[in-house]
Amino acid sequence: MNVVLSKSALENVSKHKYSGIDDSILAKLILQKYWNFCLKFVPLNIAPYLITLTGTITILLSFFIVGYYSPYLEGTLPRWVYAMSGLTLFFYQTMDNLDGKQARRTGSSSPLGQLFDHGCDSIVCTLQSLIVASVANYGVGYISLIQLFITALLPFWMATWEEYHTGVLHLGPINGPDEGIIIIVCALLSTAIFGNAFWTFKPFVASSQLLPSIIQQWLPTFIQQLMLNEIIVASLSLPCLITCFFNIKNVVQHLQAKQKPILPALKHILVWVIITVSSFIWYYTSTNLLPLSSIWFNNIRTVQFSIGIIFGELVSRLILAHMCHEKYNIIQAPLYPLILSTFCSTINYFNGTIIIPENLLLILFTVTSFVHYSLFVKSTISQLCSYLNIKCFTITKKH
């Protein structure tokens, strides 16, 4: 949907200055030196947005290649595919950090750069989550949903939400964009070397002979049967939730210092809640009514990617609202396709029969999500470029 920015909104955007703090230990010790070294090889006439887009396209290609070999998020892939997925992610991280450096080096920094960069990041978040799900053999199930919504989308939303209210994007000493990506890269490359069998390894079963009988009796059966990939998702969920707690703490302290109401700010978290709850309900109703032919089984990547597109637009709208100094509404148009699809699937479930064909539902959901997001991107970039007197993919000479 086209977004019409008011004159006051555009004026606020033109005055916006990005404020970010990266306390990453790894970045300070190693990565910053590596990125500065790479920057020397980037020609001065290359636009920062082009660097951002190049990294995003690389992840998109990786997503399609992995999807070709693993359409259902499981199975053994060729070793080169694992290696490719790790190297493309590392390349993306490099590009994601070079764009800002290139903008400052060429004097082409602009508010559009922040929106474009973080907007691409929000899409990559879902793409990379699905790539990891295939490599780690998550398959179609709640484990892949938890991995996407809890360990990927939630931290991204909360960090952006904190920035909206405090004006600062603060990354901690150990964070996802730096340490998190390097850990994933190492995991992907390790899979290329050793194969993917270790992801489905059951450590409690393998160590049953070493565990005292009292511990074996105490451990519930479902825990004893946990695979390594499931243990990893559970282990990653906890620090993600802790990080979100500190996001909330920082916002509350900031608002209290400014003597502003807290509840309206907390309501913005409902956007992530709506996306997550709707997706889980849709998955449950669809897979229980159609155990073998559900679109969540046959088209899991398409469904989750479309949800990621919706998430990406909502994140971009939050960033835009922050730059425009405007209020952010909880219920917005990008949510409608997901809410409607969940509603239709729920009707099918409670009627015990297919009233609304799922294939039709999938087509409408996917097309609507992509078209809506595309129009938003086109409209927003066009208006910002026009008002700021810049071009998106070429560096505008300043007079």
From Swiss-Prot:
Residue ranges crossing the lipid bilayer per the database entry: 46-66, 76-95, 139-159, 181-201, 226-246, 262-282, 303-323, 330-350, 352-372
Location relative to the cell? Membrane
Q: Which Gene3D superfamilies match?
A: 1.20.120.1760
List cellular component terms (GO): membrane
Does the UniProt entry include the keyword Transmembrane helix?
yes
Report the InterPro entries cross-referenced here: CDP-OH_P_trans, CDP-OH_PTrfase_TM_dom, CDP_ALCOHOL_P_TRANSF_CS, CHOPT
Name any one GO molecular function. phosphotransferase activity, for other substituted phosphate groups
Q: Does the keyword Cell inner membrane apply?
A: no
Instruction: Tell me the superkingdom of the source.
Output: Eukaryota
List, in alphabetical order, the GO biological process terms annotated in this UniProt record. Answer: phospholipid biosynthetic process
A Pfam family annotated for this chain is CDP-OH_P_transf
Q: Which cysteines are joined by disulfide bonds?
A: none
Keyword terms: Membrane, Transferase, Transmembrane, Transmembrane helix
* Alphabetical list of PROSITE patterns matching this protein: CDP_ALCOHOL_P_TRANSF
Membrane topology summary: Multi-pass membrane protein
The family annotation for this protein states:
Belongs to the CDP-alcohol phosphatidyltransferase class-I family.
Entry protein name? Uncharacterized CDP-alcohol phosphatidyltransferase class-I family protein 3
Q: Which organism is it from?
A: Dictyostelium discoideum (Social amoeba)
**What lineage, starting at the top, does this entry show?**
Eukaryota, Amoebozoa, Evosea, Eumycetozoa, Dictyostelia
The gene behind this protein is captC
